[in-house]
Each structure stands twice: as structure tokens, then as C-alpha cells.
Amino acid sequence: SDNENAGYVCGQDLLVQKPDGGKIVIVESPGVNSVNERITGFEEAITNSGFEVVKRIEALGDSSNVKDEMTQVLSENSEIDAVMCGSDPMAEQVMAAITEAQRTNICVYSVDGSPATKTALMNGTGGMTGIGAQSPINMGKTAVKVATALLADKDYEKDNYEETFFINRDNVEMYGTDGWQ
């Protein structure tokens, strides 16, 4: 997937939602290249737009630490405007903390497009505002084409990037919440 674009489209939407800028939290996993690319794209989109990163939360392997750390950030900062999450499991933890703190005025962005985050987006829960989505189905189809070419000793593209796109409340029904797009 074009991970950088997945983060970029989230940042572009944040510029629309919060045109005056604001304070943001970034939930990342520095050891994971795809997450790094997503965060880079997001930060490129919001550069020089009045946003201040007030906290970076490093998600550990299964992201289980994110909820506790986000809860602490919320208790220490009354003016968080948005949270950018490098993946949907991170976003699920952030949304849980935001819901418990009753701070649903915070815009939450994520990358993936899992059924759980699309459901939160559709229902307007946990602050979920938008998803830089990828399509595991299309990624699988491309992998099969490459494998078939390899087995047949034919030429193939060595680098394949699947298009990423933005899902929000206006178009989430088109993608559904019962599976991946």
C-alpha cells in the first residue's frame, strides 16, 4: 500500500476539520516501516498549518499500552484537538480512552480500514473522523498475479503499491462495515 498517502489523506482532512490548527497527539510505532510512512505522510500534510504535536505515544507490539497512555494524556491536556494513529488497533485503544474520558470532540484518524474502525466511524463513536484505507483484498490479488508470473518464469513488477484512499462518514456506507474493502 501507499502508506505515505494513507497518512497524507488523513492530514488533509484534519486541515478541513480544524483550519485554525490545534494540538495533536501522534500514536506511532517507530520500529514498523509502514507506520513510519503513514505518520510521515500525515505530518507532511499538516506542516506549517498551526498544529503542535504535544505528545507522541509509542505503541508496543499489540498496542495494549496505548489506552493507558492516552488516558494520561487526556487527563494532563484539556485542549487536544486530534489524534493520528498509525494503525486501527492503536485507534481502537485511543477511542476507548476518549470515550471513557467523555472527550468526543477530538478528531481521531487512523490507517487500515478494519470493520471495527469503520463501524466507529459510521456510528460517530470515540471521535473517529477518518481512515486512510488500504485494500487487503486488492493486495492479495496483486500478490497472486506476481506469484503466477514468478511460477511461469515471466516478467513482473518488483514494486507494487496499492492505492490508498480516504474513508469518512460521508462514504463509509459505500465500503461497508462487515469486512475489508
Task: Identify the meaning behind each predicted range.
Residues 1-24, 66-67, 113-118, 134-152:
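Hydrophobic alpha-helical segments within soluble ligand-binding/sensing domains
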Residues 3-7, 31-35, 59, 63, ...:
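Solvent-exposed, acidic/flexible segments
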Residues 6-10, 33-52, 69, 93, ...:
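Short, solvent-exposed amphipathic alpha-helices that sit
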Residues 19-23, 48-54, 78-81, 103-107, ...:
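Loop/turn elements at helix/coil->beta-strand transitions in domains of secreted/extracellular proteins
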Residues 23-31:
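Short beta-strand segments enriched in small/hydrophobic residues
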Residues 42, 55, 60-120:
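Hydrophobic alpha-helical
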Residues 46, 135-181:
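Hinge/cleft segment of the Venus flytrap/periplasmic-binding protein
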